[in-house]
From Swiss-Prot:
Gene: leuD
Quaternary structure annotation from Swiss-Prot or TrEMBL: Heterodimer of LeuC and LeuD.
Record-given protein name: 3-isopropylmalate dehydratase small subunit
Keywords assigned by UniProt, alphabetized: Amino-acid biosynthesis, Branched-chain amino acid biosynthesis, Leucine biosynthesis, Lyase
NCBIfam families, sorted: leuD, PRK01641.1
InterPro entries reported for this sequence: 3-IsopropMal_deHydase_ssu, Aconitase/3IPM_dehydase_swvl, AconitaseA/IPMdHydase_ssu_swvl, IPMI_Swivel, LeuD
Lineage: Bacteria, Pseudomonadati, Pseudomonadota, Betaproteobacteria, Burkholderiales
Superkingdom: Bacteria
GO molecular-function terms, A-Z: 3-isopropylmalate dehydratase activity
SUPFAM superfamilies attached to this UniProt entry: LeuD/IlvD-like (SSF52016)
Family recorded in the similarity comment: Belongs to the LeuD family. LeuD type 1 subfamily.
Cellular component annotations (GO), alphabetically ordered: 3-isopropylmalate dehydratase complex
């Protein structure tokens, strides 16, 4: 998993409340669990005028010119500014996969759905909860200033505005540790690989019949 320490990026404002995971990545694209190839279908039903199907190249689709991510000023955005209850709906992990593969590193919103919130951390995305009034201010600034960028400093737990003002945010220490070091669940487990192997060897030595049971 990619580490997250400090990131400065262009902000794209998604001015909708209750954006659910089916809007983030529609159900017809959930047939794969390879964790790759979901970026082109992020927000598919809003991003394109035609209905998307697996295997149809992005070049053959009809972009919706009114959708925020299709507007030239937001091309290359890596910080998503969202409204409350972002990521509600089903628990599909494909949603953070699609956001990550599109190029987003952080999402700022007044609130997130719990399962989506946790899935973000497990996939290298940083979800940041800020007061609704602060998010409103950021929306106004993003709309008023083309090329609007924010800096997210995870180590110091601040979002830095272009003029230098710092906005603090909270993050669970364990989640922060994992992002700073690029550890997903598998990475955390592999840090203890030697202990796991030693435990398995000792267990089989004391209970050799288990090896026959496992082989059977």
């Amino acid at each position: 998993m990619q580490k997250f320490t400090l990131h400065k990026g262009l902000v794209a404002p998604m001015d909708r409340e209750n954006v659910d995971t089916d809007a983030i990545i529609p159900k017809q694209f959930l047939k794969s669990i390879k964790k790759t190839g979901f970026g082109p279908n992020l927000f598919d039903e809003w991003r394109y005028l035609d209905k998307g199907e697996p295997g149809v190249p992005e070049s053959q689709r009809k972009p919706n010119p009114d959708f925020v991510l299709n507007q030239p000023r937001y091309q290359g955005a890596s910080i998503l500014l969202a409204r409350k209850n972002f990521g509600c709906g089903s628990s599909r992990e494909h949603a953070p996969w699609a956001l990550d593969q599109y190029g987003f590193r952080a999402i700022i919103a007044p609130s997130f759905a719990d399962i989506f919130f946790n899935n973000c951390f497990k996939n290298g995305l940083l979800p940041i909860v800020l007061p609704e009034a602060t998010v409103d201010q950021l929306f106004n600034e993003a709309a008023a200033f083309p090329g609007y960028q924010l800096t997210v400093d995870l180590e110091r737990q601040v979002v830095v505005r272009p003029q230098g003002e710092e906005i603090p945010f909270d993050v669970v220490p364990f989640r922060k540790y994992c992002l700073l070091n690029g550890f997903d669940d598998i990475g955390l487990t592999l840090r203890h690989a030697d202990k796991i192997r030693a435990f398995e060897a000792a267990r089989l030595a004391s209970k050799p019949w288990l090896s026959h049971t496992m082989a059977a």
